[in-house]
């Protein structure tokens, strides 16, 4: 077992690795205590997107998404799950990815929070971790945005 950036990698067999990625979000949503006000579906989408891109970047195939939602299922949790489903639509793998998770039904909450963990598998022969070398040209497009900056573009 080892870590690479935000990933945890576990050798399952001599040919197969399990890759685990995760991300979280807090204080962003439509609840009274949220600092950034957006539809919870947006949180589900972007939090899933971040963890999914980290997993796919090394060549892993996602098999399971585990959401830990610090909100009630009806209706905030369901909106977040809608965003999770929207994030995986472009992969055309929805039937191959098991989505499971948990919500907070015991305590009323006044702030939106969620965590996401994605588990994937990769054949060791297809493992790809590349590092930039002196001869590489690295191009970055766009402007980094966070919180309200991103919400304004929605």
What is each residue range found by the language model?
Residues 1-154:
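Helix-biased detector of long, well-ordered alpha-helical tracts
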């Amino acid at each position: 077992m080892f870590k690479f950036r935000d990933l945890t990698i576990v050798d399952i067999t001599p040919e197969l690795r399990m890759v685990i990625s995760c991300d979280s979000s807090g204080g962003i949503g439509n609840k009274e205590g949220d600092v950034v006000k957006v539809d919870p579906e947006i949180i589900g989408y972007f939090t899933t997107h971040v963890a999914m891109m980290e997993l796919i970047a090394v060549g892993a195939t996602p098999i399971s998404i585990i959401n830990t939602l610090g909100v009630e299922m009806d209706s905030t949790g369901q909106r977040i799950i809608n965003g999770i489903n929207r994030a995986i639509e472009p992969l055309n793998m929805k039937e191959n990815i098991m989505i499971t998770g948990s919500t907070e039904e015991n305590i009323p909450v006044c702030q939106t929070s969620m965590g996401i963990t994605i588990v994937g598998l990769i054949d060791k022969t297809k493992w790809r971790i590349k590092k930039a070398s002196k001869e590489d040209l690295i191009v970055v497009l766009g402007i980094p945005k966070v919180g309200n900056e991103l919400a304004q573009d929605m």
